[in-house]
């Protein structure tokens, strides 16, 4: 028979008195939930890719198998969000509203770099009650080159060539470091990354992640940003 003595429910905590005696059981509400999922972005010379799985889960329950974590912001910019799904939806709605206001005021779309700076201020304004979201913005910059911006929950951000975030990021980031960044490798020719090779790499790493991470799976949604616009591609992943 399995023992439940070591199990601890974070929302139902036993409070001890001053002499170590057991006090009343208190119910504590947590405003956050972790809904899993993984996002990944790669920037090339004239393209950028952001990809995510479509599984939305909590603990050992799957809420839906069709919940992509990539959101189109402009014709040249896409954001990938993972973490607490409620915060993902709220944050993307705020960004979309700000982009509409900017377009009406300036008669042009906001650039990818400006969107990244705007998101940084939005996240910093909520630093005392932050959004439980890992954000990656990818798109094309003013020169038409691929750009990837990664953020922490309170607004610090930097531009990268590739980045992974979410539940399987610990597995994906070393693969990107090796295959895209050629880090810690000797006597290796640094070949420029092509769109075809980047697509194959994204599919391979997500298939591998779905084998090991219970929060990643069902399907892979890929958004490819080029000067022609944004196109999407869907690849099935394992569903167990």
Swiss-Prot record:
Modification N-acetylmethionine, positions: 1
Modified residues (N6-acetyllysine): 203
Induction: Up-regulated in prefrontal cortex (PFC) after nicotine exposure. Down-regulated by theophylline (THP) and 1,3-dinitrobenzene (DNB), two reprotoxic agents thought to induce infertility.
Sites where a glycan is attached: 57, 208
Tissue: Ubiquitous.
Residue positions where Phosphoserine is found in the record: 61, 67, 161
Keywords: Acetylation, Cytoplasm, Glycoprotein, Nucleus, Phosphoprotein, Proteasome
Localization in the cell: Cytoplasm; Nucleus
Subunit organization: The 26S proteasome consists of a 20S proteasome core and two 19S regulatory subunits. The 20S proteasome core is a barrel-shaped complex made of 28 subunits that are arranged in four stacked rings. The two outer rings are each formed by seven alpha subunits, and the two inner rings are formed by seven beta subunits. The proteolytic activity is exerted by three beta-subunits PSMB5, PSMB6 and PSMB7. Interacts with SERPINB2. Interacts with RFPL4A.
Protein purpose: Non-catalytic component of the 20S core proteasome complex involved in the proteolytic degradation of most intracellular proteins. This complex plays numerous essential roles within the cell by associating with different regulatory particles. Associated with two 19S regulatory particles, forms the 26S proteasome and thus participates in the ATP-dependent degradation of ubiquitinated proteins.
PANTHER family attached to this UniProt entry: METALLOPROTEASE TLDD, PROTEASOME SUBUNIT BETA TYPE-1
Protein name as annotated: Proteasome subunit beta type-1
Organism: Rattus norvegicus
Taxonomic lineage of the native organism: Eukaryota, Metazoa, Chordata, Craniata, Vertebrata
